[in-house]
């Protein structure tokens, strides 16, 4: 069973939570749901960034014994922000923004560890996609050692569009990839910057790589082919810190 304080049960209750602007990580809906109220739910969901998964009712029953009516919403542990709101705010404050974007990272522990590093390095925000991404729940909060209480998290419909917006706003984009042209410490991290990290199995998607200004790699000197993504992120983040403080 999951902590019930992190969930909302029932179609009407979930509709009201969405309309009230609650930050919701995802919604599980039983596959064969067919009611007027469920149609209202899907209408309300249009235009939101909330991922919806259609699942067997048995899966929902394993999560809770409450009267869920085939619908369970998982409440986010953070209040999501929008990149397009945060960027002008940071520039108005005279900041030299540093963002970290996570492309396809779904492991809560990796996400929490990256968030912790970001907070320690004074990164201005972490950007994640609305779909195929981590669930920012209590486990993520715990793994981050509380960093997610203060670190802004932006959840975006399209990372590609967000990258284009950042480039138009004067950001340089650096991707960590095994296809990198040169080692990570040869890149320029001094200006407005977004570092993009991909999942360990797939890496940064091709569409997103195509928008990056620099592709960098971390040299592997042993027999293992790659680092854990949270470790790799930490290396690039602190290279940025070093260059910005020199």
Task: Mark where each language-model region is.
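RNA substrate-binding interface of SAM-dependent RNA methyltransferases
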Residues: 16-23, 34, 88-182
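N-terminal positively charged helical leader segments and presequences
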Residues: 1-89
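Surface-exposed amphipathic alpha-helices with a cationic face
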Residues: 46, 163-167, 241
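Short, acidic/turn-prone active-site loops that include or flank metal/cofactor-
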Residues: 32-33, 57, 131-133, 200-202, ...
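Active-site/ligand-binding-proximal alpha/beta "capping" segment
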Residues: 174-228
């Amino acid at each position: 069973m999951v902590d019930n304080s992190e969930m909302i049960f029932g179609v009407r209750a979930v509709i009201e939570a969405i309309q009230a602007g609650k930050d919701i990580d995802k919604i599980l809906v039983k596959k064969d749901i067919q009611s007027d109220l469920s149609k209202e739910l899907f209408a309300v969901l249009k235009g939101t960034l909330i991922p919806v998964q259609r699942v067997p009712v048995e899966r929902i029953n394993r999560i809770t014994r409450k009267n869920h009516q085939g619908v369970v919403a998982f409440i986010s542990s953070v209040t999501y922000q929008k990149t397009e709101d945060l960027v002008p705010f940071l520039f108005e404050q005279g900041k030299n923004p540093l963002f970290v974007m996570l492309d396809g990272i779904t492991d809560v522990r990796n996400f929490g560890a990256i968030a912790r590093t970001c907070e320690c390095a004074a990164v201005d925000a972490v950007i994640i996609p609305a779909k195929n991404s981590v669930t920012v729940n209590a486990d993520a909060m715990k793994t981050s050692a509380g960093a997610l209480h203060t670190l802004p998290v932006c959840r975006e419909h399209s990372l590609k569009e967000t990258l284009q917006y950042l480039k138009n706003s004067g950001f340089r984009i650096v991707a960590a990839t095994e296809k990198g042209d040169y080692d990570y410490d040869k890149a320029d991290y001094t200006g407005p910057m977004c570092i993009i990290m991909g999942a360990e199995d797939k890496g940064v998607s091709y569409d997103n790589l195509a928008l990056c200004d620099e592709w960098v790699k971390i040299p592997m000197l042993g027999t293992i082919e790659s680092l854990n993504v949270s470790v790799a992120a930490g290396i690039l983040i602190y290279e940025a810190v070093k260059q910005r403080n020199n």
